Amino acid sequence: MCLRRKLANAIRALSIDAVQEAQSGHPGMPMGMADIAEVLWREFFKHNPKNPLWNNRDRFILSNGHGSMLLYSILHLTGYKLSIDDLKKFRQLGSNTPGHPEIGSTPGVEMTTGPLGQGLGAAVGMAIAERTLASTFNKPNYDIVDHYTWVFVGDGCLMEGISHEVCSLAGTFGLGKLIVFYDSNGISIDGKVEEWFTDDTENRFKAYNWHVVSNVDGHDYRSISSAIKDAILVKNKPSLIICKTIIGYGSPNKSGLETSHGAPLGENEVLLTKQKLGWTYPPFVIPQDVYDHWNFNLQGVILENEWNKKFQGYYNKYPDLANEYLRRISKNVPDKFVDNFNKFIKELYLCPKNIATRVASQNVLEFLGKSLPELIGGSADLAPSNLTMWSKSKSIKQDISGNYVHYGVREFGMTAISNGIAHYGGFIPYVATFLAFMDYARSAVRMSALMKTQNIFIYSHDSIGLGEDGPTHQPIEQLSALRFIPNVNVWRPCDQLETAIAWKNAIERKDGPTALILSRQILCQIDRSQEQINDIYRGGYIVNTTVRSPKVIIVATGSEVKIALDVSNILFKKGILVRVVSMPSTNVFDQQDNDYKEFIFPRCLVHRVAIEAGISDFWYKYVGLTGCIIGIDTFGESGSSDQLFSKFGFNSDIISEKIISYLKSS
């Protein structure tokens, strides 16, 4: 057996042993891609196992994340803090080797992957981030940002629609440092893909403006190495390397079959496979000579030390740029940023305006853009509607050091790309579309929350208030759907002041995404005290604090807060005292201490009403099963905003009568 094959077989052996030990997992892909991984990681991949977060490391994304044991095996072999005992605990509760790669669980894992295609989208984001950051900070002889993004994908990734969205955009942007390996083994869970996947992948990607290296023997290290060298030479296009492989390579009875995809080989087949591969070692045993050839600790330290030396020279020559680079990579805001943001909010308080919250958001962006150069925005072909561009927005297509991405109509791809930009570092991304189209992107929003990504999602045209475009564009259930995703802070502000504070919360939050739900129609600014402004940060607060001993609480969000205040005035004239609560963020409110929640919603105040132009079921947690909810549980219609609010009962007189009836009946 040649040395190169022996090194690849170490990946195969560890993968089949771990899957067999766990009695679950996916051995076929690691067995099929082991030779590709050996060539990439030993000949080309730039990293430092001693410091997995070295800034100028290459990025590796396993988009076909079910083959996680391939990555875990490589990380163990190259010297990361991942032991044999960790591999033996593969897929076990509490281990750092979960079934699919999870960022934060395993050193060396750059991105949580599993839902096919999303890793590819994130990789496009990382390649965008690398190029944009490089164009901002690099100077002659000082390429402090200079590395590749490498991706493994399978048939499933390329069948997913997101692959079209993100690869089309990557080709348009000419991301020359993005190199993707396609594991073309012709097998998926259901069998041979020729029955459902007959795309001409080579010409598909050429049409995207990609460089394609086809017909690479995925089990011949010379062919693989030659293909990578070919791809590296192409600077103005991303590259796809199509590797012909055999799933379950080495298994006498399961290679080339779907039976090797997602289940242990079985004890007998493991023995037969190792015999065929010439692997004579017990389970989880790697000979020292294999470790010696795989270990990358020394080379990694040398690479990082060389970069540190270069960065020191850069720092000496360009100290301001170097400090700005370090600030951005460290995720620290600029000096005086918080003070300036607070001054900006105070100005909004002193100079009230009746404007749509999407306009208010754009005004905040005008302030943020001048204060936070790390802010990088984009919209799914709705910039004039979402209002996501500010006066100094620059398209990265026209200027690679720009700060704005025209994503085109690619909501899902846009969000996955934004996840990659966020995890790359040095940027705070925001992306936008209509709230009704959030459903296209929802899976990537969920991944953002799972990965604790600082990502900002702008969803405008937040209700039937968008008007004449009709029910296809009018969100009903989307707002609640977002709130139900764990770790997403959802804000639906009622005016420009709440909008600014929602943005401030999003910028300050480092452990998860924030969704800003914004109106198309003009909303009135509400009068508040400084104490009330402070309480906006708590997600929910009392708007009409002068009311003492109320009989009923009305809680509302967004455009319905003004309606709630009008209702309270009508009921006051009828002798009914009402407390109005604005709850711009139910998620943030739920995180408050029990005393504050009791202060807002005293248990003794059992008469409660919720008003929101969306699905009603969500609000029972606040008003109780006997509460009154004014919501919308059908789809909308085409008409003006005023007509629709009236038709669906969002009228202060109608709601007042409903509340009176509710109080009488209870």
Swiss-Prot record:
It comes from Buchnera aphidicola subsp. Baizongia pistaciae (strain Bp). The lineage of its organism: Bacteria, Pseudomonadati, Pseudomonadota, Gammaproteobacteria, Enterobacterales. PROSITE patterns: TRANSKETOLASE_1 (PS00801), TRANSKETOLASE_2 (PS00802). Thiamine diphosphate binds at residues 66, 114-116, 156, 185, 261, 437. Homodimer. Binds 1 Mg(2+) ion per subunit. Can also utilize other divalent metal cations, such as Ca(2+), Mn(2+) and Co(2+). Binds 1 thiamine pyrophosphate per subunit. The record marks 26, 261 as: Important for catalytic activity. Mg(2+) binds at residues 155, 185, 187. It comes from the Bacteria. PANTHER family: TRANSKETOLASE (PTHR43522), TRANSKETOLASE 1-RELATED (PTHR43522:SF2). Substrate binds at residues 26, 261, 358, 385, 461, 469, 520. GO terms for biological process: pentose-phosphate shunt. SMART domains: Transket_pyr. Catalyzes the transfer of a two-carbon ketol group from a ketose donor to an aldose acceptor, via a covalent intermediate with the cofactor thiamine pyrophosphate. The gene is tkt. It catalyses: D-sedoheptulose 7-phosphate + D-glyceraldehyde 3-phosphate = aldehydo-D-ribose 5-phosphate + D-xylulose 5-phosphate. This is Transketolase. The active site is at 411 (proton donor). Its EC number is 2.2.1.1. GO terms for cellular component: cytosol. Belongs to the transketolase family.
